């Protein structure tokens, strides 16, 4: 066997992100010293991004099965039964590191990559969502990152013809050196037309389709598995470049071929490119794979096998076809003006063999690359319990506080962002951004899918386990609030350096909380992603890690899209009720505490999962019975902010003259106690009666009407609230 470069030094190994111990393991697995091609392949497959070597042990604790689950983690995306022979297919992934280095392309290719994960399974993508985290609004780089990321998401999603229907955006100094871009795609497929990635059939042709391979994105997976230093800007060549028009052609070509029975297995080329797609297909099928690198379509001259295998050029797929179907498949891809090349064959060797110019340049047993990749039980320490907050004095009037909060970075309107996204393409969007969850009709039916992405990082910092539970619970509430039954979830776990025991403790705690909530709320994790090393080395040698950010994406089902509810008050005279516990006025880790009192401390609010489930079941039943006019979950900013958002959405004021006298007024209105909904109804007697029968607490708060929000006789006009609410992002982006 020839070696593309036999001079493997300690520096070469380190530059590939491998430890000396890992390099020794590679030599033992091969029984020899690897050449550069093989080293690069091991580097990519053993990167944190591909192998999950620090989190895999703990991810096994998550619930992944259920009566509704057709396919859980391990494939390109999760698959959930939605009835009538149809399935929802969805996943969320991160593109954090690339989006900090080159925000437009990083975010755009994040969207492209998650789209491919979904349509690879045979689904037509119907919706995109995103969860974004940026640094302090005062940081000089923040406007640049916001502008680039939003433009990248919109530019790619709009061109490819998939609506961007929801998401969330937060700002915090902990993200100054590492912004987060988590992208989620939801698709719909027929349950008898779902495609998987396990290769089979020795001798079957392996086909490369899509765009040509270039040098963009080489070592992208390795770069995404390390923290940043001062050289972050120099890593631009590791960021992929996307072409949404090619992606659109690829979607249509793949779905057209999928209508036949020509495909044995299919895998998109995502992180680690051709390396990961080839290894995953062969290892899942327990077969071997042989590739002729001379046949790989390249857009740049003189590309080597090392570059071809590690390139992360976008809009590419790998397929195993049934023998004799090559011409049929080629005709389809040529019609769509895409590359099509037979680059290899399935073997029974359980090795990955690469040839180039007549020589073997790689021969690796597949087991060490995939199933036997490193899995670490890293040392961890539990996050210390936060100190209880105690009483916090009021500061200013309730209404002045409300005006400040609705205009604050984490609660201000996101209109500037979502107006750059096409959220109606496809003509099936029922609820656009701005509510609790997006709602998209299942084309040609009365059914609809509801979807939301959620996490509260400040809670996770204070208590990772409780924060993990709350992320799932809030996603559950948001989906419930539009009338849908939550079915399943996907996660995107964003943390700092797992080699630091305190960070590993955050990971362990969050996963434990997520698992507990998913089991209690019957929202199994069916797909997901882990993004670690989200921290930046400071001038003094210390590291700034992001807040622990375990994002949860959920999907729910409405049997009839016309039954969905919104947050907007509909008419004057609707009675306003709080459904769920009255709350304890929990101000620890709240937006009020940060924005009004200037403090970030205290315990995270606790989540009662049994009560969460019972209250959610009640809310859905009331929506189904037509008892509720508007529904909104109470989360960031507490009851008063939820009330203001409902009033602004419907352009109808509200008067509330009730609060628990045992709780300070500001704590009552701005406390972030969990498991609660704000609703309006024109059938209050029946609502209260049903709640009593179900054992669900309800509290009458007031009535809709007028052009102001009135809290205990303190009034603020909708005009003043709206002016504050709409100002933040346009002013930031001037």
From Swiss-Prot:
Substrate binds at residues 94-97, 116, 240, 312-314, 531. Mg(2+) 2 binds at residues 117, 268. The keyword ATP-binding applies. The keyword Ligase applies. One of its GO terms (cellular component) is cytoplasm. It comes from the Bacteria. Mg(2+) 1 binds at residues 93, 529. It catalyses: N(2)-formyl-N(1)-(5-phospho-beta-D-ribosyl)glycinamide + L-glutamine + ATP + H2O = 2-formamido-N(1)-(5-O-phospho-beta-D-ribosyl)acetamidine + L-glutamate + ADP + phosphate + H(+). GO terms for biological process: 'de novo' IMP biosynthetic process. The active site is at 49, 95 (proton acceptor). ATP binds at residues 52, 91, 491, 528. PANTHER family: PHOSPHORIBOSYLFORMYLGLYCINAMIDINE SYNTHASE SUBUNIT PURL. Belongs to the FGAMS family. Monomer. Part of the FGAM synthase complex composed of 1 PurL, 1 PurQ and 2 PurS subunits. This is Phosphoribosylformylglycinamidine synthase subunit PurL. The gene is purL.
């Amino acid at each position: 066997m020839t070696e593309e470069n036999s001079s493997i030094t300690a520096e070469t190994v380190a530059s590939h992100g491998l430890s000396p111990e890992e390099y020794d393991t590679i030599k033992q697995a091969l029984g020899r010293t690897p050449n550069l091609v093989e080293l690069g392949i091991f580097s990519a497959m053993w990167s944190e991004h591909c192998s999950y070597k620090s989190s895999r042990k703990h991810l096994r604790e998550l619930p992944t099965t259920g009566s509704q689950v057709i396919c859980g983690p391990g494939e390109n995306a999760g698959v959930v039964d939605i009835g009538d022979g149809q399935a929802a297919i969805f996943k969320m992934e991160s593109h954090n590191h690339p989006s900090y280095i080159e925000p437009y392309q990083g975010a755009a290719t994040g969207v492209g990559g998650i789209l491919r994960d979904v349509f690879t399974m045979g689904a037509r993508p119907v919706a995109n969502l995103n969860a974004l985290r940026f640094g302090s609004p005062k940081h000089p780089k923040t406007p640049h990152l916001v502008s680039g990321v939003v433009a990248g998401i919109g530019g790619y999603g709009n061109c490819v013809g998939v609506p961007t229907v929801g998401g969330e955006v937060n700002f915090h100094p902990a993200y100054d050196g590492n912004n987060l871009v988590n992208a989620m795609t939801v698709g719909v497929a027929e349950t008898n037309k779902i495609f998987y990635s396990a290769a089979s059939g020795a001798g079957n042709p392996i086909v490369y389709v899509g765009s040509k391979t270039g040098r963009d994105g080489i070592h992208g997976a390795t770069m995404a598995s390390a923290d940043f230093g001062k050289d972050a800007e120099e890593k631009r060549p590791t960021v992929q470049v996307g072409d949404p028009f090619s992606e659109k052609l690829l979607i249509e070509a793949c779905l057209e071929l999928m209508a036949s029975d020509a495909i044995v297995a299919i895998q998109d080329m995502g992180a680690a490119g051709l390396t990961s797609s080839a290894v995953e297909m062969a290892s899942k099928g327990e077969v071997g794979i042989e590739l002729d690198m001379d046949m790989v379509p390249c857009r740049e001259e003189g590309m080597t096998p090392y570059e071809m295998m590690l390139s992360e050029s976008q809009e590419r797929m790998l397929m195993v076809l049934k023998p004799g179907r090559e011409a049929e498949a080629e005709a389809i891809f040529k019609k769509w003006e895409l590359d099509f090349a037979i680059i290899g064959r399935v073997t029974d060797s359980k090795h990955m063999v690469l040839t180039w110019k007549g020589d073997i340049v790689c021969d690796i047993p597949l087991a060490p690359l995939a199933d036997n990749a490193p899995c670490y039980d890293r040392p961890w320490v539990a996050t210390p319990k936060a100190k209880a907050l105690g009483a916090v004095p009021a500061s200013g009037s309730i209404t002045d506080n409300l005006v400040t909060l609705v205009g604050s970075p984490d609660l201000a309107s996101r209109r500037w962002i979502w107006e750059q996204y096409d959220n109606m393409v496809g003509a099936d969007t029922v609820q656009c951004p701005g509510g609790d969850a997006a709602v998209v009709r299942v084309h040609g039916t009365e059914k609809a899918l509801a979807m939301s992405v959620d996490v509260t990082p400040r809670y996770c910092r204070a208590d990772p386990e409780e924060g993990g539970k709350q992320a799932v619970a809030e996603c559950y509430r948001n989906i419930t609030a539009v009338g849908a039954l939550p079915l399943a979830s996907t996660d995107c776990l964003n943390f700092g350096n797992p080699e630091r025991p305190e960070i590993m403790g955050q990971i362990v705690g969050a996963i434990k909380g997520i698992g507990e909530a998913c089991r209690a709320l019957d929202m199994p994790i069916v797909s997901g992603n882990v993004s670690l090393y989200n921290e930046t080395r400071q001038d003094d040698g210390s590291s700034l890690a992001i807040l622990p950010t375990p994002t949860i994406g959920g999907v729910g089902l409405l049997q009839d899209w016309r039954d969905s509810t919104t947050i907007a008050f509909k008419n004057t005279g609707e009675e306003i009720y709080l459904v769920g516990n009255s709350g304890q006025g929990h101000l620890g880790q709240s937006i009020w505490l940060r924005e009004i009192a200037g403090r970030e401390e205290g315990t995270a609010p606790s989540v009662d999962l049994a009560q969460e489930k019972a209250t959610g079941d009640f809310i859905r039943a009331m929506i189904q019975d037509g008892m509720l006019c508007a529904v909104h979950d109470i989360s960031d900013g507490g009851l008063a902010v939820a009330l203001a958002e409902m009033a602004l959405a419907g352009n109808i004021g509200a008067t509330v003259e009730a609060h628990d006298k045992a709780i300070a007024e500001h704590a009552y209105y701005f406390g972030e106690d969990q498991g609660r909904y704000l609703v309006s109804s024109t059938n209050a007697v029946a609502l209260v009666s049903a709640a009593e029968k179900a054992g669900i607490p309800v509290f009458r708060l007031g009535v809709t009407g007028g052009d102001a929000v009135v809290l205990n006789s303190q009034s603020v006009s909708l005009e003043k609230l709206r002016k504050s609410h709409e100002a933040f992002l346009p002013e930031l982006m001037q």
